[in-house]
Amino acid sequence: MTTQLEQAWELAKQRFAAVGIDVEEALRQLDRLPVSMHCWQGDDVSGFENPEGSLTGGIQATGNYPGKARNASELRADLEQAMRLIPGPKRLNLHAIYLESDTPVARDQIKPEHFKNWVEWAKTNQLGLDFNPSCFSHPLSADGFTLSHADDSIRQFWIDHCKASRRVSAYFGEQLGTPSVMNIWIPDGMKDITVDRLAPRQRLLAALDEVISEKLDPAHHIDAVESKLFGIGAESYTVGSNEFYMGYATSRQTALCLDAGHFHPTEVISDKISAAMLYVPQLLLHVSRPVRWDSDHVVLLDDETQAIASEIVRHDLFDRVHIGLDFFDASINRIAAWVIGTRNMKKALLRALLEPTAELRKLEAAGDYTARLALLEEQKSLPWQAVWKMYCQRHDTPAGSEWLENVRAYEKEILSRRG
């Protein structure tokens, strides 16, 4: 340990102790909160099923930064490079289109064997895996409907895809000893004025019930459902709205996924966490950064990211909230995007753990809102950065922007050689 870091650490311990915070305990708690990194930042949501195909479903990755991963080996290598620069526990979130097979596999026929390389890799790197059926970028989703499709055969195809995905998810959990959270998001909706808003929702309700009908061990697999306000080409009507999935998760006791970009721009998911937790057993968070729409910009250490982290910590939701990231920026170095976004999420969690919440609660209960605001603002000036640097050192990762040198070297040696 360098003398400078040692001095800063000792000072930080004293400063936080003065407001009743044990920084060592904060670091222990931070190691209880893995962040699930999303594989699709590495290749702009291309996947391996049809890498040259178009991205559909009302989502978009903009930019053309060179060096994106073209196959599973490259994607895993890029993930390893990113993970070396991020301290603390991590998971990986996979979509079904990231299967590996020598021959084409229909989505309703995916099996655990198509993901065995990911499982072996996760074991080697001590990671948990999460999963998602991929209900987009496919000929049978081209008209904008999947699980709510009016055509029985097409709807059944997507039901079978989701059922197969649940078995893959359970395989992850069984093999890795940590439950896989499988999130269902569908792009279903309409571009313009919709006359019958009820029938697609009735079909979706029945389809989801069929999807989750097979009983799976909750120690291996957790079902989650995700709403969205709108997508490109589905501006007027989204079948899986917030109200639909809140009702579904509540009545079926599944996990509910809250995506930071899937609501009106004036809404924030940090305010929804405490409300949803009263009704659903678990939450999955997709931390993202919407810029005027669900643009999936790289996560910043901004007010909303901090508010999300604070809600988790203040209400001791460690065992009920699963933290995932969901952004994909193709205009910058993709490894840097992972590192920036994931480190920012972890910084926000650390800052939340360093808050004197008990004291703030007392002030709030006493109606002393002046002191509450004063303490919240003074908290921002306490030396949390020194605690972060110690955390990074203990996890053998760069503490500051020197991580960028590693990314640049990898870009020069590896990424620049990709076509």
From Swiss-Prot:
SUPFAM superfamilies: Xylose isomerase-like (SSF51658). Mn(2+) binds at residues 262, 294, 296. The keyword Cytoplasm applies. Its main location: cytoplasm. Gene3D superfamilies: Divalent-metal-dependent TIM barrel enzymes (3.20.20.150). Its cofactor is Mn(2+). InterPro entries: L-rhamnose_isomerase (IPR050337), Rhamnose_isomerase (IPR009308), Xyl_isomerase-like_sf (IPR036237). One of its GO terms (molecular function) is manganese ion binding. Pfam families: RhaA. It catalyses: L-rhamnopyranose = L-rhamnulose. Homotetramer. This is L-rhamnose isomerase. The gene is rhaA.
